[in-house]
């Protein structure tokens, strides 16, 4: 999100949050915090807890719910968001028909629900650039499943079958990248508040990750690759 908001190549019309690595309330709070701290006038709308057709909460792993990361931003109430993410997507796409690109870095629940609200949505969206899936490598939840698709496969099927042009950044690409301690330390040396936020956010993942390879070699990049591809 910070990469997108700091990129002059993009005009961000809005951000929607979805239940993925963290609960929907945490995602809403994190996104709202970033928008406010950057001084941007960008609406943030929250999706509903759960998935497109059923609630898979018991099967999910909250990869981001670590004590260190929970302390970075307060949990904000989502009750004031009367419109909600699906309606915002449907209305904004119609108002800007043909000029809209969606960049997704989580499950596709909000878009699937937006398709239900407006069956003509595919005619309004230019394309979707998404971090999702795996082609020639194993998944990161099961041998066959990448997390963003696994977390809500029904919504993924709905979106992939919608006819909207899709550019996918799969695990095959993500696993060719690394962001490790050396890069994080360079960012942490900068006193800018957002450099400090990145340092505090990523440090727990490198410090207490059960995967020794990640501690030694660094994290793979995922969502930022989809944002970067949207420049093109």
Language model regions located:
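N-terminal acidic, glycine/proline-rich low-complexity segments
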Residues: 1-232
């Amino acid at each position: 999100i910070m990469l997108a908001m700091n990129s002059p190549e993009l005009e961000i019309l809005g951000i929607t949050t979805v239940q993925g690595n963290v609960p929907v309330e945490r995602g809403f709070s994190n996104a709202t915090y970033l928008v406010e701290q950057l001084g941007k006038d960008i609406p943030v709308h929250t999706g509903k807890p759960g998935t497109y057709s059923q609630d898979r909460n018991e099967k999910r792993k909250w990869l981001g719910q670590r004590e260190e990361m929970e302390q970075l931003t307060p949990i904000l109430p989502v009750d004031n968001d009367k419109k909600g993410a699906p309606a915002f997507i449907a209305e904004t796409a119609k108002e800007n028909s043909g000029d809209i690109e969606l960049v997704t870095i989580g499950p596709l629940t909000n878009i699937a629900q937006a398709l239900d609200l407006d069956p003509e949505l595919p005619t309004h969206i230019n394309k979707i650039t998404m971090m999702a899936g795996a082609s020639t490598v194993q998944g990161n939840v099961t041998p066959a499943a990448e997390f963003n698709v696994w977390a809500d496969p029904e919504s993924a099927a709905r979106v992939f079958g919608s006819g909207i042009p899709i550019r996918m950044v799969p695990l095959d690409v993500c696993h060719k990248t690394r962001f490790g301690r050396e890069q994080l330390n360079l960012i942490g040396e900068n006193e800018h508040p957002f450099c400090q936020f990145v340092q505090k956010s990523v440090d727990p993942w490198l410090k207490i990750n059960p995967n020794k390879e990640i501690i030694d070699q660094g994290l793979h990049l995922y969502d930022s690759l989809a944002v970067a591809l949207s420049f093109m």
